[in-house]
Amino acid sequence: MEKLSVIVPCFNEQETLQDYYDAISKVRETLLGKECELQVILVDDGSKDKTLAKMKELSGQCSWIRYISFTRNFGKEAAIYAGLTHAEGEYVSLMDVDLQDPPELIPEMLDIIRQGEYDCVG
């Protein structure tokens, strides 16, 4: 089965992580129906709130969620790079945790990239 890794950089996102989890969990079910596993990599970029605690909670509940934690704020690009180095999927998506880009679009993007005409879909 193929795998899609979603890299999610986070900085002080304790309030939005649960909403993101709720949305991406539904997407996971859709992807499994398309013969694709989901791996979510949450990257804590030195948050000062309880973002890391929430990440630990979610990863403890779900084997398909992993987290990486920085000791201080290194910036979004460093968080993305760290996530990419741990991605296991044949496909990778970068996504902000604030749901600005709806996770519900991921299955449609997967369908497009699987057609083989494109190397990148956004």
Summary of predicted features, one role per range:
Residues 1-122:
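Structured catalytic core of nucleotide-sugar glycosyltransferases
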